[in-house]
A protein has these predicted regions:
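Conserved N-lobe loop of protein kinases adjacent to the ATP-binding glycine-rich P-loop
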Residues: 39-46
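Protein kinase glycine-rich loop
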Residues: 23-31, 35
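AlphaC helix of the eukaryotic protein kinase fold
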Residues: 53-75
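Activation-segment/catalytic-loop signature of the eukaryotic protein kinase fold
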Residues: 87
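Activation segment signature within eukaryotic-like protein kinase domains
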Residues: 124-125
Length: 159
C-alpha cells in the first residue's frame, strides 16, 4: 500500500489542505511519508508539507502518534532544528507544515564535492550533536537521521 502512495503523486498535485496549503511539487518520498513544496495562501509564502501515508489514516494509533510527534517537535526552538508551523488533517490526509529550507543537504554536498575535510566534518558533527542533545532534553528523538535530512545552512548551521 505504501507503494501506491509513493508512486502516484498526480492525485495530490494541486490539492488544497485546510483551505490554505496548495501542494505544488513533490520534494521527497520515503518511510511512509511524502514531503511537498506548498504555497501558503494565507501568508503568501512557500512551505514544506509532510504527508503521512493516506492508507494509515484508518489506523488511529498511527495518526495519534503522528499528531503527538508534531506537537512535541513544534515545541522545539533551536537554530539547527526546522520549525513546525502548523498541522492539518483533511479527509484522508494528515500533514505537518514545516518551514521550507532550500539549502543543500549534506548528502548532495558530499556527492558534489567529495569527502568532507576533517575540520568541516567536526564542525558539522558538533552542531548536529548540539541540536540532538537539545531535542533529547525535550523528549524528542529523530529516529531517521541521515545526510539527506541534514541541510547545510551557512547562516544557521546544519538543520
Amino acid at each position: 500500500m505504501t507503494e501506491s502512495f509513493n508512486s502516484d503523486t498526480r492525485i495530490l498535485l494541486g490539492r488544497k489542505l485546510s483551505g490554505r496549503y496548495v501542494l505544488t511539487s513533490l520534494i521527497s518520498s520515503e518511510s511512509g511519508t511524502q514531503t511537498w513544496l506548498a504555497k501558503d495562501l494565507v501568508l503568501s509564502r512557500e512551505v514544506a508539507v509532510v504527508l503521512t501515508n493516506p492508507f494509515q489514516v484508518i489506523n488511529s494509533d498511527h495518526i495519534s502518534l503522528f499528531r503527538k510527534e508534531a506537537k512535541l517537535i513544534s515545541r522545539l526552538n533551536h537554530p539547527s532544528i526546522i520549525t513546525v508551523l502548523d498541522t492539518t488533517g483533511d479527509e484522508d490526509l494528515e500533514a505537518i507544515v514545516i518551514e521550507l529550507v532550500k539549502e543543500e543537504t549534506l548528502f548532495d554536498y558530499v556527492e558534489r564535492t567529495g569527502p568532507l575535510s576533517l575540520t568541516l566534518a567536526l564542525q558539522i558533527t558538533k552542531q548536529i550533536g548540539d541540536a540532538l542533545s537539545y531535542a533529547h532534553e525535550k523528549g524528542v528523538f529523530h529516529g531517521n537521521l541521515n545526510p539527506k535530512h541534514i541541510f547545510l545552512c551557512p547562516d544557521r548551521g546544519p538543520q
